[in-house]
């Protein structure tokens, strides 16, 4: 009887500590951009949970970008379109609320550059590029690093634009 009680207590202690560490503690921009770059649906789902710790005024933009990124990884066309539309609404809402936020313009540019033509989400690429270049020096180091990293595979942004 005693061993059963000890076993149950140890089990709950271990389970509680493992589950307690399952959720990331804090939103980090560097981690967000790492997930955006080499995303898997599971990594995106984890980051969507982490975004709940992001500042409220920025949460919609990050969440929208992740949902649109996730849409590109799904198999069913219906799911892809649904996630893309949800993400688009969130990101565009964030841009309307804060039209000078260069980071959100960068996120939109990433999505626009890789979006299929059928979703007709390419109209603001040049506008976003201009705002990103103009505001580059004012962005946080994590975002600047993400932009320069993105330039390596971009047809729109180039490292020379920021010299």
Q: Residues of each region from the PLM?
A:
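Terminal, low-structured helical/coil segments at or just beyond the last alpha-helical repeat
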Residues: 128-163
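Short coil/turn linking the two alpha-helices of tandem helical-hairpin repeats
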Residues: 37, 69-78, 114-119
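Helix-turn-helix repeat elements of alpha-solenoid scaffolds
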Residues: 34-48, 80-88, 121-122
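Residue-level recognition of tetratricopeptide repeat
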Residues: 56, 101-102, 139
